[in-house]
From Swiss-Prot:
This is Alpha-crystallin A chain. It comes from Balaenoptera acutorostrata. The lineage of its organism: Eukaryota, Metazoa, Chordata, Craniata, Vertebrata. It comes from the Eukaryota. Zn(2+) 3 binds at residue 154. The modification N6-acetyllysine is found at residues 70, 99. InterPro entries: A-crystallin/Hsp20_dom, Alpha-crystallin/HSP_16, Alpha-crystallin/sHSP_animal, Alpha-crystallin_N, HSP20-like_chaperone. The keyword Transmembrane does not apply. Acetylation at Lys-70 may increase chaperone activity. Residues 144-173 are annotated as: Disordered. Glycans are attached at residue 162. Residues 1-63 are annotated as: Required for complex formation with BFSP1 and BFSP2. GO terms for cellular component: cytoplasm; nucleus. GO terms for molecular function: metal ion binding; structural constituent of eye lens; unfolded protein binding.
């Protein structure tokens, strides 16, 4: 049984019809047509704001799954190469850091950096952790769980990011 753990603020009571501008801010992504023509969305209601209707795989949102046999983290890092990513395990936490220096794109210069930290369950076998980056930019961090009586082994170490040639098989929510 897979359990999808997501941040609670993404589960809105009214779904995509809830007028929220704070969570619809995607810095460095460019403007959409309705951003330039706000009167089109205000003809419906002055309080209505069109949602961006982005999927989990398209918005940079991470997904954590923990079932009886394994622990998996899916993270969209499509703007980063494996050389730009650092994955470390320190005690009960996995830290994923991505940074690429300033480079030129169609609109000028851009640089990106993120830092995510996740708590590992106590029964994850830290000696068997793996991390891979799919062709479509989905980082998958996974590790098997051990029975509760066995030692999971806690230490600090870096996890290498391997490159996969096929797209991710992560489910979109």
């Amino acid at each position: 049984m897979d359990i999808a753990i997501q941040h609670p603020w993404f589960k809105r009571a009214l779904g995509p019809f809830y007028p929220s501008r704070l969570f619809d801010q995607f810095f460095g992504e460019g403007l959409f047509e309705y951003d330039l023509l706000p009167f089109l969305s205000s003809t419906i209601s002055p309080y209505y704001r069109q949602s961006l209707f982005r999927t989990v795989l398209d918005s940079g949102i991470s997904e954590v799954r923990s079932d009886r046999d394994k622990f998996v983290i899916f993270l969209d890092v499509k703007h980063f190469s494996p050389e730009d990513l650092t994955v470390k395990v320190q005690e009960d936490f996995v830290e994923i850091h991505g940074k690429h220096n300033e480079r030129q794109d169609d609109h000028g210069y851009i640089s990106r950096e993120f830092h995510r930290r996740y708590r590992l369950p106590s029964n994850v076998d830290q000696s068997a952790l793996s991390c891979s980056l799919s062709a479509d930019g989905m980082l998958t961090f996974s590790g098997p769980k051990v029975p509760s009586g066995m030692d999971a082994g806690h230490s600090e170490r870096a996890i290498p990011v391997s490159r996969e040639e096929k797209p991710s098989s992560a489910p979109s929510s």
